[in-house]
Amino acid sequence: MTTIQPFEPVDLFKTNNVNLDILTENFPLEFYFEYMIIWPDLFFKSSEMTVDPTFKHNISGYMMAKTEGKTTEWHTHITAVTVAPRFRRISLASKLCNTLETMTDVMPHEVNFIDLFVKCNNQLAIKLYEKLGYSVYRRVVGYYNSAEDGYPDTLKKVDDNKDAFDMRKAMARDRNRSVRPDGRSHKCYPHDVRF
């Protein structure tokens, strides 16, 4: 049985089963603490009750999000949504995303849209987000470039391993103004992503 609960500082010691995975982005401790302090209601975990006595409530995944922007750009940004390999393929990522949507579509947040960035070559994640109602708003060329790659010098050179799709889902108060049907054809540089 899955429960959704607020993420607590001590949970950082219980997420190895989630974070020690090549598909999961890891951050410095202060980054996690910043989210717990500033956006505590948008940083939550899924826990599983198991029969194993060493894990009373096994953390199966978590959602890290924040609110940002002003006026028409007021939105929730998903920084990380991740599920432990053992608990994948049982719709936990969908449950975490749906929980976030329910929370931020109403006051005190009442955002216009939810957005996230996903590597252009991550077809599994893209399909999941599309199933949840997200669509590509634009392609951010060179979003995942390393220091060795340098900053992109043209929008014409795309690389599915280095570029990100900025995916969005419009919320009730937005009425689809923050999404576009032809998002894959719109390209921008990483510095153009400002809220």
From Swiss-Prot:
The keyword Cytoplasm applies. Its EC number is 2.3.1.254. It catalyses: N-terminal L-methionyl-L-asparaginyl-[protein] + acetyl-CoA = N-terminal N(alpha)-acetyl-L-methionyl-L-asparaginyl-[protein] + CoA + H(+); N-terminal L-methionyl-L-glutaminyl-[protein] + acetyl-CoA = N-terminal N(alpha)-acetyl-L-methionyl-L-glutaminyl-[protein] + CoA + H(+); N-terminal L-methionyl-L-aspartyl-[protein] + acetyl-CoA = N-terminal N(alpha)-acetyl-L-methionyl-L-aspartyl-[protein] + CoA + H(+); N-terminal L-methionyl-L-glutamyl-[protein] + acetyl-CoA = N-terminal N(alpha)-acetyl-L-methionyl-L-glutamyl-[protein] + CoA + H(+). SUPFAM superfamilies: Acyl-CoA N-acyltransferases (Nat) (SSF55729). Pfam families: Acetyltransf_1 (PF00583). Keywords: Acyltransferase, Cytoplasm, Transferase. One of its GO terms (cellular component) is cytoplasm. Residues 2-172 form the N-acetyltransferase domain. It is found in: Cytoplasm. GO terms for molecular function: protein N-terminal-methionine acetyltransferase activity; protein-N-terminal amino-acid acetyltransferase activity. One of its GO terms (biological process) is regulation of actin cytoskeleton organization. It is an enzyme of class 2 (transferase). InterPro entries: Acyl_CoA_acyltransferase, GNAT_dom, NatB_acetyltransferase_subunit. The keyword S-adenosyl-L-methionine does not apply. Catalytic subunit of the NatB N-terminal acetyltransferase, which catalyzes acetylation of the amino-terminal methionine residues of all proteins beginning with Met-Asp or Met-Glu and of some proteins beginning with Met-Asn, Met-Gln or Met-Met. NatB acetylates TPM1 protein and regulates tropomyocin-actin interactions, it is presumed to N-acetylate 15% of all yeast proteins. Component of the N-terminal acetyltransferase B (NatB) complex, which is composed of NAT3 and MDM20. Belongs to the acetyltransferase family. GNAT subfamily. Present with 639 molecules/cell in log phase SD medium. This is N-terminal acetyltransferase B complex catalytic subunit NAT3. It comes from Saccharomyces cerevisiae (strain ATCC 204508 / S288c) (Baker's yeast). The lineage of its organism: Eukaryota, Fungi, Dikarya, Ascomycota, Saccharomycotina. The gene is NAT3.
